[in-house]
């Protein structure tokens, strides 16, 4: 890309703290994701359209998008087949990521219940027994640990089972379950659906685009109502179900005089121990000896959301702020587990004093100081990691340190249980507010950052438009962090809402945007939607609700979008998925699915137009329910 087309810091992000760090990076000659994006332009149009196939070694094959050249791959696969297969593989990868996260959480729970992981303990006993009851496990004449062992075995069976249903799907409305069964997309077992994705997309197996995509919906349901939901539930049992609390966000949470430890990734199994170790008197004494006034843990991405929701641990930023946190020059250790971690951090941390510490047996990166984390010695390993950060504090180069002042208060911790508790124990007050028109509907806005969209621009503007029009927003993941940075997660943000929503928020003392957790915690939104639908005796697809992922980028987001739509929620995507090379697949996703499962996708990069689509949909559902 020519120098004259290079984006300025202000064009890359709407967040002022990020703009400051982007300018610092440019001044210091430090490369960021935005620079690498510009180096990639123009991006491969075949890849963008989804019409390149590498599924066998006769290829790669690509289809002419204009219909003037090659119309089939060597095996005879058309654009429809190739696009559908590629999309299915994206769903498989996304579902695998969430579900493997869940597997590790359950295995940790199992080790804890067997006395093999002494650093962990049950923090929500009520949820333990509630979940056990759901799985048909009697607690009579059994110790808590015996119940936990049985529950762990039952949850693990959801991964390997060959016949369905996955038990958590029973939380969905009866009409939705019946529809899934009639369509043949009721998920049977988490691992089975993912394996079948890979089998179907092997050369010479499934070659009907609609048939392929229906299995994609089934696989995504094994994520949303399986892996993700199991992860959320068992993490609540282990670490506590979130309740409303206050904290702070953005790069300004980093400290000038404390040891800064960033936890980044997605699994709270590690970060819970890091938070605990940072309060260890021995390590605090060592920090003082090294010249620091304490130890400051801050999060990035969903590991950050997990500790934020349960402990009020501050968050330094979103996916696209991970490099910027290091560029402050004030981070002693960047501690990572899995998912959404840029391999660029290896080279970047080498430009500063920051230790880049990888901990997962599944994920290593260039330039890391590897400190593999195992549940059996969880706290001891966490102490070693924090100790390494503390000992690195004297190496901080003050000439390179520049921490933006920007930080914003936020109110978080709105699990489904916390929301229902705030409503008096049932969704009835929420339903009354919707029926009366004070709240027009619910907007679920989630997802990643993407350098193709100005950082946080899509997230913040879409959400502002929704609340202005009396739509209560529930949020997770990087959208939640972006909204927090923009000051939308405080009760005072009700001033930006329409009069109806404003009145509800002021009466309850809540923000107009409710932080429900990490990306796996979108399952909390499904639970809440089901509770409302069941109270009304309708399907989720009948509710005045809509979803959006304004800046999505990961394969996990593809799986999320598929299971949200499969659950009956119209969903707007802010970046274009690689499907436009097939008119048939595009038409099915944006129109055809509505007649099949009661919801569909729309693609709209402009957040204001995306909000209009969601508001139009919500208004249509209100009219269908007889609401004004």
From Swiss-Prot:
Keywords, in A-Z order: 4Fe-4S, Iron, Iron-sulfur, Metal-binding, Nickel, Oxidoreductase
Superkingdom of this protein's organism: Archaea
Catalytic activity: CO + 2 oxidized [2Fe-2S]-[ferredoxin] + H2O = 2 reduced [2Fe-2S]-[ferredoxin] + CO2 + 2 H(+)
Top-level EC class as recorded in UniProt: oxidoreductase
InterPro entries: CO_DH_a-bundle, CODH, HCP/CODH, Prismane-like_a/b-sand, Prismane-like_sf
Entry annotated with the keyword Transcription: no
GO molecular function: 4 iron, 4 sulfur cluster binding; anaerobic carbon-monoxide dehydrogenase activity; hydroxylamine reductase activity; nickel cation binding; peroxidase activity
Cofactors: [4Fe-4S] cluster; [Ni-4Fe-5S] cluster
Gene Ontology annotations of biological process type: generation of precursor metabolites and energy; nitric oxide catabolic process; response to hydrogen peroxide
Binding site for [Ni-4Fe-5S] cluster: 266, 302, 340, 448, 478, 519
Comment on bound cofactor: Binds 3 [4Fe-4S] clusters per homodimer.
Domain characteristics, as noted in the entry: Cluster B is an all-cysteinyl-liganded 4Fe-4S cluster; cluster C is a mixed Ni-Fe-S cluster which is the active site of CO oxidation. Cluster D is also an all-cysteinyl-liganded 4Fe-4S cluster that bridges the two subunits of the CODH dimer.
Function (record text): CODH oxidizes carbon monoxide coupled, via CooF, to the reduction of a hydrogen cation by a hydrogenase (possibly CooH).
Family, as annotated: Belongs to the Ni-containing carbon monoxide dehydrogenase family.
Name of the molecule in the record: Carbon monoxide dehydrogenase 1
Originating organism: Methanosarcina acetivorans (strain ATCC 35395 / DSM 2834 / JCM 12185 / C2A)
GN (gene name): cooS1
